[in-house]
């Protein structure tokens, strides 16, 4: 059995991954113990491949499901049904998170955006009091799918849907609901690149230069000295006449007194 496990692990390209062989072997042995009274309608190849699938999920490494399906000798529906049964027998009924899905499908570059969308969905669900169980894996799956769409990352729906536990028609309906939610509530947060920042800085510098030149343009030209001199003399004479008139008025009042 150990030799067969090693052969299949190697064929799946997991031989160099740390702890996969050990974890797969552990799950195969545990499955044999717990399935004593539960007849499993599956061959040894399928059993080992499914345990390797579960082991990869637990460790958090990518797993090629298409290659696994070929090696297992099972139809897709049989593969998925047996996987769910194994999860129950092995107490592995953990709900798939955004990170789990991204890791298993090799979509780590969209994980941050998917988490952002998941947080948005939870906020909208709480605000609108929808009574939604946001822990259901369909929502984490849809968050990853929509993140791929927004970031223009190609992903196959057929690879995502098994995580959601939805039928194709249900998945399509959920997809439409999320697209409406994103259109209404989601705002793209763009981190400016160094090129954008340089362009903005140059634009600000140009605006400052233009503003300085405009101020210079509005500044009146320097007054000719002779004109200034005449204006100052006229102003002084007017002030002197005003003082003389005021003094004359005061003298008249004193004489009358």
UniProtKB/Swiss-Prot annotation:
Keywords from the named record: DNA replication, DNA-binding, Nucleus
Segments for region (Disordered): 186-222
GO MF annotation, one: DNA binding
Gene Ontology BP annotations: DNA replication; DNA replication initiation; mitotic cell cycle; septin cytoskeleton organization
Cellular compartments annotated: Nucleus
Database matches in InterPro entries: ORC6_cyclin-like_2nd (IPR054113), ORC6_cyclin_first (IPR008721), ORC6_met/pln (IPR020529)
GO-annotated cellular components: nuclear origin of replication recognition complex; nucleus; origin recognition complex; plasma membrane; septin cytoskeleton
Biased composition (Basic and acidic residues): 197-222
Oligomeric form and interacting partners: ORC is composed of six subunits.
Known function: Component of the origin recognition complex (ORC) that binds origins of replication. DNA-binding is ATP-dependent, however specific DNA sequences that define origins of replication have not been identified so far. ORC is required to assemble the pre-replication complex necessary to initiate DNA replication.
Entry similarity comment: Belongs to the ORC6 family.
Name of the molecule in the record: Origin recognition complex subunit 6
Gene: Orc6
